[in-house]
Amino acid sequence: MGKFFLRFFVIIFILAISIIFFLSYIGLETNKFNDLIKSKANEAHQHVKLEFKKTKIHLNPKELNLVVKLQKPKVLIKNNEIILSKLDLFLPLRSFITSDFLLKRAQIAFFENNIKDLSKITGLFLPKIINKQLNKIFKEGNLEGEFVIPFEPDGSIGKDYGFSGKVIDASIDLPKGFLIKNLTTEINLGKEIENGGLVATIRKGSLFDLQLADSIINLKLKKDETIIKSLLHTNGKISFSQIKEISSLLGLKTNSFKDINGKVDLKTKINFILGKKFKIKNLSYAMTGDIAHFVIDTEEKKIIKKYLPEYNSKVVLKNTNIKLFNSESDLITELNGLIKVKDHFDSFKVKKK
């Protein structure tokens, strides 16, 4: 009798392990939740429809819950199709028995989607004219990433949502002729990010002839404004036309210069608040870095030339460290390096307000 019970429990144990293994790694195909999932999704927004071929139920032994995996999921937003690579719904174990659709969280992933899919999503809440402009900004590139969306017991979306993803090999056509090329950026959003905001870290990309790798942009979205903190790493060649375009954004004047060109490696902090109607306020900036070679050709002052015949309107710098920052209404510049005097370079140090 003892051997019989031992064999019985061994068989039950092996059977239980086999079922757990099957449900964890292979899954059980079912249509138990199909209609309910579609109706719940379509109730969320009148212009959003969820479509999928079938569902598979998996056991999640780590959290002791069920995972409903939708097969070949896609979202239709105002008849615009967005293909998803994954849409997993996490439910309590009792949901399979009671048919109560008590959603705990959802994981939504997409892989190698066209960057223009962004404007399909933003079209739900942005005015049509603004969304058209946004669609023009995103010229080309791919998207990949994953949303994790928690749900409260009453079915509402929880606060601890998050997103992690990438923009890959994109071209971003910004206003005033600013074209960012070959942009690859990591994007993270959620409670684990500083102040619960969004952080974009540029891994590669270029603006004009400047490389932007290792630049970081932090956004904190509030009710009526967006707080933007950025650290822009620019490395490469610069020209006078580029200087004028960038200076216009910072409110700097270039009237006294005839030409500027050089090669730099700079880190620039730019912080500001973007208010209603995209109005910029509380702008502050600071720059540090190294200048390998820099030529500044200023407008020649005849009065100075008259009394200082050796005066040269062209300034040539090399191997120079620069620090520039604004303090209230003052702009402070510090330079320390080599400056060309006649046919040779001399060391110099300047601090100017």
Where in the sequence are the language-model features?
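Extended amphipathic, helix-rich lipid-handling scaffolds
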Residues: 41, 87, 106-172, 192, ...
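Short, cysteine-centered beta-strand-loop-beta hairpins and adjacent loop/turn segments enriched
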Residues: 73-81, 174-177, 296, 344
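Hydrophobic residues on conserved beta-strands that form the core of alpha/beta folds
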Residues: 50-54, 68-70, 84, 103, ...
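N-terminal Sec-pathway targeting helices
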Residues: 1-16
